[in-house]
Curated annotation (Swiss-Prot):
FAD-binding FR-type domain span: 602-713
Gene: YNR1
Name this polypeptide is given: Nitrate reductase [NADPH]
Subunit details: Homodimer.
Species the sequence originates in: Pichia angusta (Yeast)
Reaction(s) catalysed (UniProt annotation): nitrite + NADP(+) + H2O = nitrate + NADPH + H(+)
Length: 859
């Protein structure tokens, strides 16, 4: 460090200073968290301690979170590590403390001298700096865009930003040592995590790495402590002024290149596509994603209101109230002004801005946490600022809202209008807080709440307002507005025949179809439909329609059907039900009574989670107590049941499952479920499986059934579509969690000493760890080797165990031919439950071999 002034303004290390509050610049040193939360103990992150105050945005795993907005603001310039927002694409890599200094990074690609270096050597060989940097997720404020039109990403509120003191070396120094080629333009960065679509890799421009104004770091400490696992322990990249998605965590590799990264995450994440590109267009054409012009690097200008808080109530008086919040910008450009409007943007008031980063700049050179603080060497602004404005409460009482906007030193100003895009990223239209007068008090509404309903956007949307109109969808006589339309029910728009909307169906006529097996009429949202034309084609079988004949099926229908399914209903629409609001509905969930059998195909009943057994990183056995200890489930072998829960918005979500437990088990119901956690392709993950995953012991879930067209009786006797069969053999084709219905039949066969039905099972999975119930299946095969055979198949050929003796690859015609060779049609039946690709192979094989459909059951 001879080239840098070493006579620092503050000659003592920060740990030796008794009272850091006396320093003229912000400093904090956080004590590491130690307690792992119960939710995380059940995931691959079972070693990561986290703050329970963080708002989880994607369920329990992977962990994505932001702090409560007020708590973030009240923490001040430097955010506690425990409250720093988190964006993880998968499980956190486990790095023991004793291995931190041996962590190794490779530098390769278009360089003269590629090399590898350990963290201990980085600390010894390179100049070390401590720098305050604000990090921001590109999806910050995404939920506001999703309220207008659902995009591809999960919901973020306005608190997806945090600031820390990062300690490490400059990325440019590490790259410079390898002597990059003059033709090189980019640096690829790769982490050690392994999310759903492979290792996370992205890139930045090489010239930025070499620019001291950019101050791009490789950091190993945050606020004076080793990196927390969620934030990249033991080593990460920190890129100020750029979206957080470029600051790769758990850094393992740096590759110098002449082109941008070609990694999946670089292509399909962190892009702002043109606003006219719909989710369907983006999904069907990769060219949108691979256009580097749409890649996000620098942050855009953003200002947020934190005070008043959402739903805060203030009594009107003669006092003043201080409106306050924060702002940030990208590319190192300072925010030059922040303005507040109390009259819908007609006039603006200039807020006072505080730039805490400048206090480091003014202090000169000094050392913190073993690193030189040299903010004074640069002009760039890499941190957020804080603003405030005092206004009379009487003026707030005359206002309908508070608006905020910023302008940077380039005179770029925040837009009034939202720029909607598929990823809902970089949303920075004016932040608006609505003011609701309630007598002599004022209540304030922020746009949204990150992980639950709430805010003025929810209210406006429910009232039928247009969030994007000239008054944000609010009713205001002083502002010219388009005629306010009643709220349009999107479900009915898809489901109804406009010509039948005025046809009235008498309730007596509707009720006459109760229990009808030929003309099943059912009601959804007050409209009547005739399901008879779809009995044979319904994917869930005719029984799914017949069980709601003559009843209001609103909750169940909306909970389980996609938009595609809803668009099939106009041809079945008969009209609206007479005085549906005045009809007394039978209560759908009855009080627990001492009933011998739990299930009822027409009524929901509640069961209670008693235990959750973690089988693997994404598979669990949920064990539910029935209504009393002697009660049977009442589920025939081969059929399934419905489970339903309410999501965070209060809407029912319903899915069909087949229990793992035998139907002879009393007082308990065990269901094996594979949890589909959120990922890039499906940012919300499996909605129902994540709701079930978040259940706590003692929570209740609703159950109804049985449903399904197949039932196994005993000794080869079964029924399918109400027709009896006598089978000698079953060929079972299962994939992943689709093993559960076939396992039900297996249990019935091999628990009966008189049952000699033979079974051949093909069980396909991606990796060895994905194979469910393997111990149970192997036990049956060992005990009945002549009667039962199972072929395990793995499709991920790049990660096959060396000693793998099972099938390699996916299901083929040859495999199916082998299974039925020597068997006569009519003596065997196929039982199939797998993903669409696997089911498609079976269907094509059946067509090619002219196998009658009556012998093929798709669960």
């Amino acid at each position: 460090m001879d080239s840098i002034v070493t006579e620092v303004t503050y000659g003592l290390e920060i740990k030796k200073i008794k009272d850091i509050t006396e320093l003229p610049f912000p400093v904090r040193q956080d004590s590491p968290l130690t307690e792992v939360l119960p939710t995380d103990l059940k995931t691959k992150d079972n070693f990561v301690a986290r703050d329970p105050d963080l708002l989880r945005l994607t369920g329990s795993h992977p962990f994505n979170s932001e702090p409560p907005l007020t708590k973030l603001y009240d923490s001040g310039f430097l955010t506690p590590v425990s409250l720093h927002f988190v964006r993880n694409h998968g499980p956190v890599p486990y790095v023991p403390d004793e291995n931190i200094l041996d962590w190794e990074v490779s530098i390769e690609g278009m360089v003269e001298t590629p090399y590898k270096i350990k963290l201990s050597d980085i600390m010894e060989q390179f100049d070390i700096y401590s720098t305050p940097v604000t990090m921001v997720c590109a999806g910050n404020r995404r939920k506001e865009q999703n309220m207008v039109k659902k995009g591809a990403g999960f919901n973020w509120g306005a608190a997806g930003t945090s600031t820390s003191l990062w300690t490490g070396c400059m990325l440019g120094d590490v790259i410079g040592k390898a002597r990059p080629s003059k033709r090189a333009r980019f640096v690829w960065m790769e982490g050690a995590d392994n999310p759903a679509n492979g290792a996370y890799r992205t890139c930045i421009r090489l010239s930025w790495c070499m620019d001291p104004e950019r101050c791009i770091m490789i950091a190993y400490q945050q606020n004076g402590e080793w990196l927390h696992p969620d934030h990249g322990k033991p080593l990460r990249v920190v890129i100020p002024g750029v979206i957080g998605g470029r600051s790769v965590k758990w850094l393992k590799k740096l590759v110098v290149s002449d082109r941008p990264s070609e990694n999946w995450y670089h292509y399909f994440d962190n892009r702002v596509l043109p606003t006219m590109v719909t989710p369907e267009m983006a999904k069907s054409d990769d060219r949108w994603w691979k256009d580097e012009r749409y890649a996000i690097y620098d942050l855009n200008l953003q200002t947020i209101i934190c005070k008043p808080e959402n739903q805060q109530v203030i009594k009107i008086s003669e006092d003043e109230y201080e409106i306050a919040g924060f702002g940030y910008n990208g590319g190192g450009v300072r925010i030059g002004r922040i303005e507040v409007s109390l009259d819908k943007g007609k006039s603006w008031k200039l807020a006072d801005i505080d730039y805490p980063e400048d206090r480091y700049r003014e202090a000169g050179y000094f050392r913190l946490f073993g690193g030189l603080v040299n903010v004074c060497d640069r002009m760039s602004c890499l941190c957020w600022c804080f603003w405030k404005l005092k206004v009379p409460l009487s003026e707030l009482a005359r206002s309908k809202d508070i608006l905020i906007r910023g302008m940077d030193e380039r005179m770029m100003v925040q837009p009034r209008t939202m720029y909607w895009n598929v990823t809902s990223m970089l949303n920075n239209w004016w932040y608006r807080v609505a003011i609701i007068r309630e007598g002599e008090s004022l209540r304030f509404e922020h746009p949204v709440v990150a992980n639950k309903p709430g805010g003025w956007m929810d209210r406006v949307k429910a009232e039928g307002g247009d969030i994007l109109d000239n008054n944000w969808g609010e009713v205001d006589d002083t502002v010219k507005q388009a005629e306010r339309r009643p709220h349009i029910d999107e479900d009915l728009e898809m489901m109804c025949n406009r010509e039948k909307m005025d046809v009235v169906i008498k309730y007596s006529e509707f009720e006459a179809h109760k229990d009808s097996e030929t003309e099943p009429w059912f009601a959804v949202k007050g409209q009547v439909f005739d399901g008879s034309s779809y009995l044979e084609d319904h994917p869930g079988g005719a029984q799914s329609i017949l069980m709601v004949s003559g009843e209001d099926a609103t909750d169940d229908f909306i909970a389980i059907h996609s938009s595609f399914a809803k668009k099939l209903l106009p041809s079945m629409h008969l009209g609206r039900l007479e005085e549906v609001s005045s009809v007394t509905k039978v209560k759908s969930v009855e009080q627990n009574v001492k009933r011998e059998v739990l299930l009822d195909p027409r009524k929901w009943h509640k069961i209670t989670l008693a235990e959750k057994e973690v089988i693997s990183s994404d598979s669990r056995i949920f064990k539910f107590d029935l209504e009393h200890s002697e009660q049977l489930s009442g589920l025939p072998t081969g059929k399934h049941l419905f489970l339903r829960l309410k999501d965070s918005s209060g809407k029912y979500v319903m899915r069909a499952y087949t229990p793992k437990s035998s139907n002879s088990l009393r007082g308990r119901l065990e269901i094996l479920i594979k949890v589909y956690f959120p990922n890039r392709e499906y940012p919300n993950g499996g909605i129902m499986t994540n709701l079930i995953e978040n259940l706590q012991v003692g929570n209740q879930i609703e159950v109804k059934g049985p449903v399904g067209e197949f039932e196994y009786v005993k000794c080869g006797h079964c029924s399918f579509n109400n027709k009896p069969y006598q089978m000698k053999h079953f060929v079972m084709i299962s994939g992943g969690s689709g093993i559960t219905p076939t396992y039900q039949v297996l249990q019935a066969i091999f628990s009966d000493p008189e049952d000699r039905t033979s079974v051949q099972l093909f069980f396909g999975n991606k990796k060895v760890d994905d194979i469910l119930l393997r111990e149970e299946l192997d036990h049956i095969q060992e005990k009945y080797p002549e009667q039962f055979k199972v072929d395990y198949s793995l499709s991920d050929l790049d990660h096959l165990p060396e000693n793998w003796s099972g099938v390699r690859g996916r299901l083929t015609f040859d495999i199916l031919d082998t299974y039925v060779r020597g068997k006569k049609m009519g003596e065997y039946m196929l039982l199939v439950c797998g993903p669409p690709g696997m089911n498609g192979v079976v269907e094509n094989w059946c067509n090619a071999r002219k196998l009658d459909k009556q012998y093929v059951v798709y669960f």
